[in-house]
């Protein structure tokens, strides 16, 4: 429902006059129809073509790309991490993953990467959950799911504000009925400015750790995901490098997470991996019942291939991170 609600057929980009717009639309539809008539491959190829176009659009969009696209190389690392067994990661991928959640899902590419990795390893995946604030990007994600052959009964992408937690599914007050997910992945907007009210201090997501500052909601996103993670689940989130050393309330949240044993691994990545920013980033891996109590630090900041626009991680770089 509403999948094409953001398409503006009256846009001046199609022509100033009604007749001009009509002519151009007819030409576009005719070309698409010709392509479909010659298209005889499987659904995955159609979905991959759509994913490729999103990637090409992201490459040309610069900073705007950060709103909807996670580079494939980053997505591969996150999906590999959350599909490993939480207590015995050396044993390889899980045989099944009941649910996966991305609370800032963009075009849905990260969720689909988790699904693809599980399927490729001969495993099974249950329900896919996502949340996206931008209405256009929300529709992109739903379309991406359908074009990759994910049935509408197998996924639930919701349009809403994660920080406000305005998804009824997640606002269940009965602890016994609180939704929890086997895997949580996210690439939320970096250092996002927000306006937490006084009531946020009593929000169950932040009550035990503290509320992130107005200047940067990074830890608010992290705590949101951790709150809905199962006790034996794995969460992997991309955040700006600053979350590792900024002071004030962020330092207190970070210390509490460490003391509670929730931070499993910190992976430092090279700068300039994203279309939207050149700052260095890190991956934080979180668990609720991790063993042992120490934290693994992986410094991959110097391992990359320099590209024209962005630095690149090769398959070898990615494999070394995951194997470690």
What are these regions (language model features)?
Residues 127-132:
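Conserved SAM-binding motif I beta-strand of class I
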Residues 162-165, 171, 175-324:
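A conserved structural/catalytic subdomain of Rossmann-like adenosyl-cofactor enzymes
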Residues 95-104:
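Conserved class I S-adenosyl-L-methionine
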Residues 111, 136-140:
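Short alpha-helix immediately C-terminal to the canonical SAM-binding loop
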Residues 140-176:
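S-adenosyl-L-methionine
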Residues 107-123:
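Conserved SAM-binding loop of SAM-dependent methyltransferases across substrates and taxa
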Residues 82, 122, 229-230:
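A generic alpha-to-beta junction signature in SAM-dependent methyltransferases
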Residues 1-87, 153-162, 268-271, 292-301, ...:
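Non-catalytic, mostly N-terminal accessory regions of nucleic-acid modification and defense proteins
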């Amino acid at each position: 429902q509403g999948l094409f609600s953001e398409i503006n057929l009256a846009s001046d980009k199609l022509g100033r006059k009604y007749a001009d717009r009509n002519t151009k639309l007819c030409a576009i539809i005719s070309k698409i129809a010709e392509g479909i008539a010659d298209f005889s491959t499987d659904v995955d190829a159609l979905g991959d073509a759509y994913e490729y176009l999103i990637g090409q659009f992201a490459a040309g969009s610069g900073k705007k790309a950060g709103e909807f696209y996670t580079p494939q190389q980053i997505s591969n690392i996150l999906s590999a991490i959350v599909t490993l067994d939480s207590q015995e990661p050396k044993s390889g991928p899980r045989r099944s993953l009941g649910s996966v959640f991305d609370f800032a899902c963009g075009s849905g590419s990260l969720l689909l990467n988790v699904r693809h990795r599980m399927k490729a390893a001969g495993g099974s995946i249950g329900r896919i959950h996502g949340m996206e604030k931008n209405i256009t990007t929300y529709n992109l994600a739903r379309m991406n799911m359908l074009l990759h052959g994910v049935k509408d009964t197998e996924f639930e992408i919701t349009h809403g504000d994660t920080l406000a937690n305005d998804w009824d599914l997640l606002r269940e007050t009965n602890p016994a009925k609180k939704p929890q997910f086997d895997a949580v992945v996210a690439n939320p907007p970096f250092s996002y400015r927000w306006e937490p009210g006084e009531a946020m201090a009593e929000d169950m997501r932040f009550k035990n750790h503290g509320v992130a500052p107005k200047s940067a909601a990074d830890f608010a996103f992290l705590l949101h995901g951790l709150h809905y993670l199962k006790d034996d689940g794995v969460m992997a989130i991309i955040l700006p490098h600053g979350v590792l050393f900024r002071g004030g309330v962020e330092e207190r949240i970070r210390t509490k997470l460490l003391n509670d044993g929730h931070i499993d691994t910190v992976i430092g990545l090279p700068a300039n991996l994203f279309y939207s920013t050149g700052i260095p980033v890190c991956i934080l891996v979180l668990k609720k019942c991790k063993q042992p109590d120490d934290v693994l630090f992986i410094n991959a900041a110097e391992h990359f291939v320099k590209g024209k626009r962005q630095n690149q991680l090769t398959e070898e770089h990615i494999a070394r991170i995951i194997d470690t």
